[in-house]
Amino acid sequence: MHAPFGFSTEPVVWPSGLSFLAVENIALDDYRRLYDTVGREWHWVNRRHLTDRQLASLIHHPACHVRVLYRGNKPIGFVELNARKFPEVEIVFVGLVSLEIGLGLGQLMVRAALTEIAALKAERIIIQTCTLDHPSALPLYQRLGFVAYDRKQVVIIDD
């Protein structure tokens, strides 16, 4: 899916007790723990078996932007942006721990990511979704202005 640039770029106002922070060179163990906690229920597998070197080459790349959502000091979600193909930027991952789903925080995270992407002066924004994602994901992306531009079938082996 890709988004037209009609979305709001107003800064997101976070509820009390929440902060959405850029984490440069996130520790690999912290990333793996957050990725697994957020993504296991949704069968996120493509990063699970990477070596430290492979993972670091992705998430520590200067064109990769990781933002973590915290409730107090506890990470409860994250967004990962990939700007390696700039002026195209991909929202690679967006997700929350299960207890935080349904509170509107996913929408706030995507809106904050879109504001950051707009500041980069991107010309195209990509986000991928699939039938394994939370049922609210696709309707959220559509409400925010994303439209489907391609469809493909992929087999995921989750061991």
Task: Give a label for each model feature.
Residues 65, 123, 147:
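Short acidic/polar active-site loop segments enriched in Thr and Asp
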Residues 23-46:
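Helix-loop element at the rim of GNAT/NAT acetyltransferase active sites that forms part
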Residues 101, 127-137, 154-159:
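Conserved beta-strand-loop-alpha-helix junction that forms the acyl-donor binding cleft
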Residues 1-24:
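Acyl-donor-binding surface of acyltransferase catalytic domains
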Residues 48-53, 59-98:
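A conserved beta-strand-loop-helix scaffold within acyl/acetyltransferase catalytic domains
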Residues 137-141, 146:
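Conserved active-site tyrosine of GNAT-family acetyltransferases
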Residues 97-111, 120, 132-136:
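Conserved glycine-rich acetyl-CoA-binding loop
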Residues 117-129:
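Conserved GNAT acetyl-CoA-binding A-motif
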